[in-house]
């Protein structure tokens, strides 16, 4: 079986928006025989972009999974979004992939969102190869793209191909391993002629090959010895070194082409097979057993079954689809599995291999593979399903908290019930989407990662669930925290004949910067019985959801229970829960609470002519400029700006730059809001 696993490649395609990821994926599907005709994103016909909104907007929102074959290898390919509002899709894909292809725009090289997805891939130790796309575009520069990798990503980027021609004259590439020229006919089947290197490229190719060998030989001792003794390295020697370097995540080979013009994708597929790891080349996945002991799984089909659910989607024909990556053992359809995260037993009705949103039924799946499961009702993103006799919880995924919210109201009574169902289904699919009811106003609030994120979700409610809603203006999700240390008492006593209520606690509250809520039990001598400690913690967690300044969630607080008392008859869990919330209210009077506002990382690209105007506008929005650099004939500005100042920025940037400026924005951190903002928020709160 390990022989078979050696032939698997689980890889994703990642990039900045508009670098050509989906077009590259479409060409891969065409060349591997999965598609008989090529879909283009600008026509709204791309196979991988199957949601209605994706076809309209020409961007990828969800990570579509598909499988294909290439030169005897089985490929599981995941196309991920490049838009920053949908990074959860990138995050959960990278968690289960063994390798990735980073697609760069040949003119722009590394762009802001490239840096974001690159960081995410580094976090999960995902080996990568790089495809410099759009080499036919005006201003395309392969060598500049490599420089941006070195300067902006700080990595060892090594060309294993170089382009022949550029812009409209781009005709093919020189393979530096074989030292041959590949000249493409530009037709859909990507036929090419292998020729000798053109005379005017020989010197450049020799220099670049020598550089490549210098970079890669260090990854294999035998090859290094050969190289140092002046022996000629074979193609296999070089490939072996590149593969080792890629798998170690210390080397990033760079290829070039233009997917849209059918040049270079077949060679990219060869590189996927040659250099990206198989499931047995990657480190084992870690987890904990039911006793909390660490455990490892080695992608071995003979070990007990364990898999990670990395995505939930609703299919109009079969209902709930759960995408899983199998790390150990084998799974057959019609069998039962144990969800160790939720402590529930579930039945696998059917197993399907997904080709975008089409389904091919399979009977079983083994370690190293990816598929979708029909029949799991309680399993959500990040859950581990496994063999009941050998429970395990695999490393879980941590997702960012939503930073923007808005209210939604059903237009009619009939829409009310449908809306609740739609929201619960959408929340199941997307861990960065939250929905709750505002206790004071009774409004239904939805929260997410950005305006586009919420816009798409509201659109899906209308289309997929036929729910008509009125949408409120976007609101910032502020937070609150304490800045001083204080001891606070919470006492809840109710005694009026019959059994009463008695709960009494002393809790120390202190700031816990960037560490979230932390609860510590320092009770000695049973002053508060053990069985009530959990209720004290629950009472605090509940109290934290509504802060003292403006009712926003209180974060980054450490609470230590150190004293209290109890009553033999009247004490109860509920009484201690209430006592804890009273202690929180007391602490809020003396711990000097402050309002925190979300600060966003903003990357703006503007033509030189509008640079001053754009900089002035950022400063006006309380932005702090962190850096700027020249990119071609444009300026790239990095800044930190409060989210509350960024509403309507897209429109202003368009008018300030005659429609030529671009920006991306993502959450960075929470920071204390100025007094004027706090007063404004409190005043708005008082009006409600």
From Swiss-Prot:
One of its GO terms (molecular function) is translation elongation factor activity. It comes from Ureaplasma urealyticum serovar 10 (strain ATCC 33699 / Western). PROSITE patterns: G_TR_1, G_TR_2. Gene3D superfamilies: 3.30.230.10, 3.30.70.240, Elongation Factor G (Translational Gtpase), domain 3 (3.30.70.870), P-loop containing nucleotide triphosphate hydrolases (3.40.50.300), Translation factors (2.40.30.10). Its main location: cytoplasm. CDD domains: EF-G, EFG_III, EFG_mtEFG1_IV, EFG_mtEFG_C, EFG_mtEFG_II. HAMAP family: EF_G_EF_2_B (MF_00054_B). Signal peptide: none annotated. Disulfide bonds: none annotated. Keywords: Cytoplasm, Elongation factor, GTP-binding, Nucleotide-binding, Protein biosynthesis. SUPFAM superfamilies: EF-G C-terminal domain-like (SSF54980), P-loop containing nucleoside triphosphate hydrolases (SSF52540), Ribosomal protein S5 domain 2-like (SSF54211), Translation proteins (SSF50447). GTP binds at residues 15-22, 79-83, 133-136. It is found in: Cytoplasm. GO terms for cellular component: cytoplasm. It holds the Pfam family EFG_C. Residues 6-280 form the tr-type G domain. This is Elongation factor G. It comes from the Bacteria. One of its GO terms (biological process) is ribosome disassembly. Belongs to the TRAFAC class translation factor GTPase superfamily. Classic translation factor GTPase family. EF-G/EF-2 subfamily. Catalyzes the GTP-dependent ribosomal translocation step during translation elongation. During this step, the ribosome changes from the pre-translocational (PRE) to the post-translocational (POST) state as the newly formed A-site-bound peptidyl-tRNA and P-site-bound deacylated tRNA move to the P and E sites, respectively. Catalyzes the coordinated movement of the two tRNA molecules, the mRNA and conformational changes in the ribosome. The gene is fusA.
């Amino acid at each position: 079986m390990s022989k078979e696993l050696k032939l698997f490649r689980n890889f994703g395609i990642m990039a900045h928006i508009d670098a050509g990821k989906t077009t590259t994926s479409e060409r891969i599907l065409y060349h591997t025989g999965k598609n008989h005709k090529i879909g283009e994103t600008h026509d709204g016909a791309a196979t991988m972009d199957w949601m209605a909104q994706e076809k309209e907007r020409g961007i990828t929102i969800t990570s579509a999974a598909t499988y294909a074959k290439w030169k005897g290898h089985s490929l599981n390919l995941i196309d991920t979004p490049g838009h920053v509002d949908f990074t959860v899709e990138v995050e959960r894909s990278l968690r289960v992939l063994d390798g990735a292809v980073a697609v760069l725009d040949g003119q722009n090289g590394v762009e802001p969102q490239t840096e974001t997805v690159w960081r995410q891939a580094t976090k999960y130790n995902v080996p990568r190869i790089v495809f410099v796309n759009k080499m036919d575009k005006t201003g395309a520069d392969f060598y500049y793209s490599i420089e941006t990798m070195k300067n902006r990503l700080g990595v060892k980027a090594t060309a294993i191909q170089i382009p022949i021609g550029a812009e409209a004259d781009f005709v093919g590439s020189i393979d530096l391993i074989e030292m041959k020229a590949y000249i493409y006919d530009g037709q859909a089947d990507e036929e090419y002629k292998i020729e000798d290197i053109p005379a005017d490229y020989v010197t450049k190719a020799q220099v670049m090959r020598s550089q490549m060998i210098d970079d890669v030989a260090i990854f294999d001792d035998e090859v290094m010895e050969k190289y140092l003794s002046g022996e000629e390295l074979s193609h296999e020697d070089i490939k072996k070194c590149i593969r080792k370097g890629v798998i170690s995540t210390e080397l990033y080979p760079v290829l070039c082409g233009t997917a849209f013009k059918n040049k270079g994708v077949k060679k990219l597929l060869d590189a996927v097979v040659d250099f990206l790891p198989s499931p047995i080349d990657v480190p084992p996945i870690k987890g904990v057993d039911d006793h909390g002991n660490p455990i490892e799984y080695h992608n071995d089909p003979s070990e007990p079954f364990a898999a990670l659910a990395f995505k939930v989607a609703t299919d109009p024909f079969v209902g709930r689809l759960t995408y899983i990556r199998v790390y150990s053992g084998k799974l057959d359809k019609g069998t039962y599995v144990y969800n160790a995260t939720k402590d529930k037993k579930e039945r696998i009705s059917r197993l399907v291999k997904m080709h975008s949103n089409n389904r091919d039924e399979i009977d079983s799946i083994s370690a190293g593979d990816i598929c979708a499961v029909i029949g799991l009702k309680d399993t959500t993103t990040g859950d581990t399903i496994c063999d009941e006799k050998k429970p395990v919880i695999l490393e879980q995924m941590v997702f960012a908290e939503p930073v923007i919210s808005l209210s939604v109201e059903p237009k009619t009574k009939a829409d009310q019930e449908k809306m609740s169902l739609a929201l619960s289904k959408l929340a199941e699919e997307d861990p960065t989407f939250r929905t709750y009811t505002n206790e004071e106003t009774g409004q239904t609030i939805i929260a997410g990662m950005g305006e586009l994120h919420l816009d798409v979700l509201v659109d899906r409610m209308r289309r997929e669930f036929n729910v008509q809603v009125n949408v409120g203006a976007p609101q910032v999700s502020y937070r609150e925290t304490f800045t001083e240390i204080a001891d606070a008492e919470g006492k809840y006593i109710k005694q009026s004949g019959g059994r009463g209520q008695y709960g009494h606690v002393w809790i120390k509250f202190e700031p816990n910067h960037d560490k979230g809520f932390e609860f510590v039990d320092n009770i000695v001598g049973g002053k508060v019985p053990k069985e009530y400690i959990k209720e004290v913690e629950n009472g605090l967690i509940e109290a934290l959801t509504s802060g003292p300044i403006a009712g926003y969630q209180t974060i980054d607080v450490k609470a230590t229970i150190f004293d209290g008392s109890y009553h033999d008859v009247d004490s109860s869990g509920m009484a201690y829960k209430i006592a804890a919330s009273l202690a929180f209210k007391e602490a809020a009077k003396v711990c000097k609470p402050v309002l925190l506002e979300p600060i966003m990382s903003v990357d703006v690209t503007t033509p030189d002519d509008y640079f001053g105007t754009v900089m002035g506008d950022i400063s006006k929005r309380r932005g702090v400029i962190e850096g700027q650099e020249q990119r071609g004939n444009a300026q790239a500005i990095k800044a930190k700006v409060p989210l509350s100042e960024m509403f309507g920025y897209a429109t202003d940037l368009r008018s300030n730059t005659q429609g030529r400026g671009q920006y991306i924005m993502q959450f960075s951190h929470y920071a204390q809001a100025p007094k004027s903002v706090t007063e404004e928020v409190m005043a708005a709160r008082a009006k409600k």
